[in-house]
Amino acid sequence: MNYLFTSESVSEGHPDKVADQISDAILDEFLRQDPESKVACESFCSTGMVVVMGEVKSEAYVDIQTTVRSTINRIGYNKAEYMFDGNSCGVMSALHEQSADINRGVERGNEEEQGAGDQGMMFGYACRDTENYMPLPLYLSHRLLEILADIRHHEPELMPYLRPDAKSQFTIEYDGETHQPVKVDTIVLSTQHDEFVPASLGRMSYADAVKQYGQAKVDFEMQAKIRYDVETILIPRLKAALPEETARLVHSFILHVNPTGKFVIGGPHGDTGLTGRKIIVDTYGGKGAHGGGAFSGKDPSKVDRSAAYAARYIAKNLVAAGVADECLVQLAYAIGVARPVSVFVDTYGTAKNGLQDGEIAKKVSEIFDLRPAKIIDRFGLKNPIYAPTAAYGHMGRKPYTQAVTVQGKRKIVQFFGWELLDSVPLVKKAFGL
């Protein structure tokens, strides 16, 4: 029997994502000046204010005010009417020095034996739903909001009422036997917007339209216009951006647009934002598992982040190599200890050639060096690469290289290196595939 599975995403303007982006922008600035920086930066944002908190050990000086304000303005919160404006909001910093007790366990004379920054378990997941080995409902949720943001930033005349905050949700019907996607069942989109008068009511101010037609009529026509634009502009652009095989699944679906009827008050004025509250959006949309640790604002000595990236890399390369059609990898660490205390693999019964999950986990431990220092080196995690990860998912992104400034010099660095498939030949050889 077929079944439904749902995942959601949130836009760069969602208050929790604003906080994530602030934290990662600050982390990048520390790493840009001092790649050995140890940073745990949390951000809080609400009406007209941002508070930055956390622990740092670094030789760098970061202008917190400038970094915070430029991040907020880039997202699009640059008008006083939003009640959260990068040019005028209050910014308070409460950063202080990292605990010496923690630092003692992380920094070692032999860098290769650098201990894990904390205990815990981290998960990586991959499947064959999509070309990037991500679950389809989350993949589509991210892409829809990326396209919406692109319209808001670069073609505002198409949907001129858009504001930065938005949420999306996709429900996918799966085949009960093959567990492959059959079709999109339901799309939910809530997008923040200006109060405006649609052309159907004539040219006048919103206040005058309410006087003439009444609040209910104006708001109904306003939402009808937004829905029309979603159906005729946004959804077609989503389908055009998808691989043909995936685009064919987007048909005859249920669509909910701003189901509350109005979404004018939003962003940090509508809801408080806090770093690390969108960990399922950041990872796999509820598929697989999550160890509980957030990513943004944490330097790579924190295995919450670096080991989660490594686990995704392993799972993706295993699936791409044909070891299994679906794969969950768990890594677990003890604070101050370099090597993981356990490596676990679950292929959900999809492993090929009679392979057992325990056998796969054993080979993973042999193939991949999972000490934090080696993970950091493999993916170049001491570089300022984190700001782009803080919206639209840390996983399933397209890897690329770009020139950045580090310690006053330009260098080419890898972004989203954990999404590379460069270990597929090694995996195939190890498993005789």
Show which residues each predicted segment covers.
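N-terminal, positively charged regions that mediate nucleic acid binding
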Residues: 1-40, 430
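Glycine-rich, mobile lid/loop segments that gate access to catalytic sites or pores
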Residues: 6, 66, 73-265, 391, ...
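Conserved phosphate/anionic-ligand binding catalytic regions in large, soluble enzymes, centered on
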Residues: 8-10, 14-19, 115-131, 264-289, ...
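Alpha-helical support elements that line or immediately flank enzyme active sites
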Residues: 12-31, 129-149, 298-322
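A short glycine-rich, hydrophobically flanked beta-strand micro-motif that places a catalytic Asp/Glu
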Residues: 39-41, 166-172, 253-257, 323-334
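Short, charge-patterned binding micro-sites
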Residues: 40-58, 335-339
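Internal helix-turn-beta structural module
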Residues: 46, 326, 333-433
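C-terminal catalytic subdomain
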Residues: 277-279, 284-328, 339-346
